[in-house]
């Protein structure tokens, strides 16, 4: 997962 990526956001 790339930096700054939030799957739970």
From Swiss-Prot:
It comes from the Eukaryota. It is found in: Secreted. It comes from Pelophylax ridibundus (Marsh frog). Expressed by the skin glands. GO terms for cellular component: extracellular region. This is [Asp6]-bradykinin. The keyword Nuclease does not apply. One of its GO terms (molecular function) is toxin activity.
């Amino acid at each position: 997962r790339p930096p700054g990526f939030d799957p739970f956001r």
